[in-house]
């Protein structure tokens, strides 16, 4: 029986994936390595330091350190969130439905805590989450399950009794590895991807979620 719902953040609560794309393309281009949308899509859900390390291995640059590149990307994404960030369709209604069922609500994200606070503050939903956890403090980010396991721990719920809501295959792997039930609301780049079949449930948007559907999952 489900006792909690744990949301991913980027691409689930807020349509921030385009912000990450714009920031990566701008920063990597400044380093002399033109970055494409396809490059960005290949690393959706990956923790930012691991993402930068990945591209450094493939396309090493001179000058700024990897840590400095991480900060440049984060600064740009944060600025875009504060100026343009909006809740994804159905998010507020989904939170209402989940709370009405008496389920605990948590967050498990690859983004750093500072960005989490920026997003939740921008959307005005910080008080809706009983527990927030970031892979920033984990040895490994998604697809490793620790960020989900420790988010569940903060909620006081066993992972097997949690529903994880994800938009990326990387995050979906993390949720399943944590023994959670998984709902995928796929990023547009992943629509139709056969790998998403490992999810327990799939919706095109959180706006499709309704009380009867949630009740059937909770049992």
For each feature predicted by the language model, list its residue ranges.
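Active-site neighborhood of HAD-like aspartate-dependent phosphohydrolases
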Residues: 1-42
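Conserved SAM-binding loop
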Residues: 13, 105-108, 164
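Metal-dependent phosphoesterase signature
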Residues: 34, 54-93, 101-103
């Amino acid at each position: 029986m489900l006792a909690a719902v744990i949301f991913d953040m980027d691409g689930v609560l807020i349509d921030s994936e385009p912000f990450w794309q714009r920031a990566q393309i701008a920063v990597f281009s400044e380093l002399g390595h033109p970055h494409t949308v396809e490059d960005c899509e290949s690393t959706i859900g990956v923790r930012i330091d691991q993402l930068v390390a990945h591209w450094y291995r493939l396309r090493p640059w001179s000058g700024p350190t990897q840590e400095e590149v991480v900060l440049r990307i984060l600064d740009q994404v944060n600025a875009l969130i504060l100026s343009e960030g909006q809740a994804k369709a159905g998010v507020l209604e989904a939170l209402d439905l989940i709370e009405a069922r008496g389920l605990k609500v948590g967050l498990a994200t690859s983004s750093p805590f500072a960005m989490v606070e920026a997003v939740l503050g921008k959307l005005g939903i910080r008080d809706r989450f009983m527990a927030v956890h970031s892979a920033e403090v984990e040895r490994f980010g998604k697809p490793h399950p620790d960020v989900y396991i420790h988010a569940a721990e903060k909620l006081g719920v066993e992972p097997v009794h949690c529903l994880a809501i994800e938009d990326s295959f990387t995050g979906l792997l993390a949720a399943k590895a944590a023994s959670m039930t998984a709902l995928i609301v796929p990023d547009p780049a992943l629509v139709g991807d056969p790998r998403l079949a490992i999810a327990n449930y799939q919706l095109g948007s959180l706006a499709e979620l309704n009380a009867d559907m949630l009740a059937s999952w909770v049992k």
